[in-house]
């Protein structure tokens, strides 16, 4: 079962809470209700959806919900675990040969690791392995970019549709200039679509696109670590060398902690 990335919903709730707090603290509950206007919301959401339909094929749009859900899930692979796996595999490969690693495949969940090890067992040349695995990385990156682009475009479109809604409201307001008492309320309603467009863009669409970009970056980084581990296995590098080489990819803070622990053990 995938864990929930709590920072995403918490961040959205914090943003909404600050807006609600600012409105209520300035004018009370009645002022807050003035910020709720269903037609304005429909103009922005409907307009964004319409432009997304024009911009992307149906097959891609169907996946928008699934792609967006990734921003609310936490499934980051631990780099330290990957390093530990390849240290263990390199020890076994040096003792028993590369063919012995076939028995370890059932215990490995990551399909990318499995694919790399199978290529190594089959005796594929290191450069060919690197080329094949990097081609897969490029495919993953392109697929993620396509999914993320829907949220990036929605973030661009939302403020524009907010402005369109405001223009519609202003036209309607100007047509009722003969009733000055309604100008203030009509102007407020006209501006609400701009408010909704800016809010959706800066609190939902763009942040989700940024979160997805960060997750993609981490996934590609882990796959690069795996490639180096597979090449090390094929080259018959000893476990200490593999560990030292792959540790370079670990976060700086964790590397420093490991170095301190090693110094303590040596002392």
From Swiss-Prot:
InterPro entries, per database record: Flag_MotA_CS, MotA-like, MotA_ExbB_proton_chnl
Topology with respect to the bilayer: Multi-pass membrane protein
Keyword Lyase (UniProt): no
Compartment list: Cell membrane
Keyword check for Membrane: yes
Keywords: Cell membrane, Membrane, Transmembrane, Transmembrane helix, Transport
Gene Ontology cellular component terms for the protein in this record: plasma membrane
Spans through the membrane: 4-24, 32-52, 154-174, 188-208
GO biological process, one term: bacterial-type flagellum-dependent swarming motility
Cytoplasmic side, ranges: 209-267
Domain of life from the UniProt record: Bacteria
Coarse class of the protein's main subcellular location: membrane
Family matches, as Pfam families: MotA_ExbB
PANTHER family according to UniProt: CHEMOTAXIS PROTEIN MOTA, MOTILITY PROTEIN A
Family, per entry: Belongs to the MotA family.
Job of this protein: May be involved in some transport function.
UniProt-listed NCBIfam families: PRK06926.1
Protein name as annotated: Uncharacterized 29.3 kDa protein in ccpA 3'region
Native source species: Priestia megaterium
